């Protein structure tokens, strides 16, 4: 007897949602969707334990969408996400799922976007709000977000919000929501802090546990490039030129990005096309047919649009935007290496996305090697190789004698000057090279690449390795470690704003990705504060800090001048730690004891401290993309 397969219709979903799922290519529910949707449709609270990428966005979106009232122009569903990338992704997914529900609007609220843009969107009366905890809390304090009509609350990746330090904001938001709403919480792990939230805010939640099905692909050569030195679209062109591929698929996060990247590639002479959820089925099939028969070489797609895509020609996958989960990454790179062919996969990683790279590596139990951006020398070599291949192809053609006869008719410009065939060949070579010149200008010098701290890169330390402590009075005062010349900056937040040293340290460390050991003395005044940071801060970092907010107030950071040298033993913020306790060497942001301020952050100049182990085993050095591994 054939095994019965559950469909989305079997779960009780109505026609508008089923129609949207059909448009998006969803065929059958994933395990977490099959488990969660019936409970959420019946109004139960749900506690879902599943890895990201298991389909949980649809698991909570579909039933909550079905239960909302499109006529009520007020927030009825609130989704909390740890990052703006995930918030945008969830908002787009819910927009797609509700495309056939008349009058339903979705808004994403996250830091970095202008408030006036978000306020205009909120005035339209969206029924669904997706946002990061910090920005949602800002709107609640301003009175611009009304949750009095809320019927459904979702905490997506709750353990990640805990890891990033948002859990207090999450609890503050949840405490302001009126009783009687439905709550769904999803987390890959279940630490005690998350358990505490479930006990305090959830009503007899139905637990759903789904095991991860991630598998690795040893037949696919994988690598990543840290975004640095040029824009991603410019770097993409370099990588495509350096790599030999039959066909490629470029994965991006949003529909707009598919169009932007496709336009950039078309400008550079690549035969490419976008594939996104706004395309009708006929156009989608036509685009895929062009890719299969060789009329199209590069496809730029979102995860949803690429669902079910199977084209043997694809030999290269570029993750232009890093996926938010490991399973999506595996699904993406699985588009190459089909039918026994070798495949290559490249991942673009921005500095603030390094945790996502670590998650992928941990889940897949492998280390993805880093590659360098192809330089001018490599590009010149590749262009010459491709041009030589075209010349060789013409040398094998049968009608060369006709063209050889034409050579005698090409006369030199000066009378009596003999025709030099080598010079003539060089002139023809220059004419035939096209827009991609065979002689590539050397790369402009770039600032040294900065090294960025990643908590997971610190090796375990045994407390017994510290050696004897000795009597306190016998120990010399701890001297401030030499981190180079410092400069003094002023920020426009002070004691009157309720700011504490820990708020400033957190903002600088998180927004600038700077290790706390490079943050010097901080002094709090009534209306402002001063902070010492390493000399040579790049202009874009200072500009970013100018816009960064602490307790909802812009820092407006300004350089005052060089910091005065200090005697040994001085302490930041009057010699107290982040919580007011006296520090011995300080603590890192995860609460672990840090003797002598251990950690591996970066300076603005990009220099590494001597005596430190490298972040990963780089004994073989970085690989060149497109070169020999």
From Swiss-Prot:
Alphabetized GO MF terms: ATP binding; ATP hydrolysis activity; protein homodimerization activity; RNA helicase activity; RNA strand annealing activity
Subcellular location: Cytoplasm
Family: Belongs to the DEAD box helicase family. DeaD/CsdA subfamily.
Quaternary state and interactors: Interacts with the 50S ribosomal subunit upon shifting to 15 degrees Celsius. Also found associated with the RNA degradosome at 15 degrees Celsius; binds RNase E (rne).
Note: When overexpressed suppresses cold-sensitive mutants of rpsB (ribosomal protein S2) and pyrH/smbA2 (uridylate kinase).
Function: DEAD-box RNA helicase involved in various cellular processes at low temperature, including ribosome biogenesis, mRNA degradation and translation initiation. Exhibits RNA-stimulated ATP hydrolysis and RNA unwinding activity at low temperature. Involved in 50S ribosomal subunit assembly, acting after SrmB, and could also play a role in the biogenesis of the 30S ribosomal subunit. In addition, is involved in mRNA decay, via formation of a cold-shock degradosome with RNase E. Also stimulates translation of some mRNAs, probably at the level of initiation.
ATP-binding in keyword set: yes
Positions contributing to ATP binding: 50-57
GO CC term (a single one): cytosol
GN (gene name): deaD
Protein's name in the database: ATP-dependent RNA helicase DeaD
Phylogenetic lineage: Bacteria, Pseudomonadati, Pseudomonadota, Gammaproteobacteria, Enterobacterales
Effects seen without this gene: Cells lacking this gene grow very poorly at 15-20 degrees Celsius, and accumulate an abnormal large ribosomal subunit and precursor-23S rRNA. A double bipA-deaD deletion has a more severe growth and ribosome phenotype than either single deletion, but the same level of pre-23S rRNA as the single deaD deletion.
Disordered: annotated segments: 438-481, 560-629
Native organism: Escherichia coli (strain K12)
Residue ranges occupied by any Helicase ATP-binding domain in the UniProt entry: 37-208
Induction details: In response to low temperature. Induced by cold shock (42 to 15 degrees Celsius) (at protein level).
Motif extent (DEAD box): 156-159
Entries under PANTHER family matching the protein: ATP-DEPENDENT RNA HELICASE DEAD, DEAD-BOX ATP-DEPENDENT RNA HELICASE 47, MITOCHONDRIAL
SUPFAM superfamilies named in the record: P-loop containing nucleoside triphosphate hydrolases
Motif (Q motif): 6-34
GO BP term, pick one: positive regulation of translation
Enzyme class: hydrolase
Known catalytic reactions: ATP + H2O = ADP + phosphate + H(+)
Enzyme Commission code: 3.6.4.13
UniProt KW DNA-binding keyword: no
Extent of Basic and acidic residues compositional bias: 446-481, 568-629
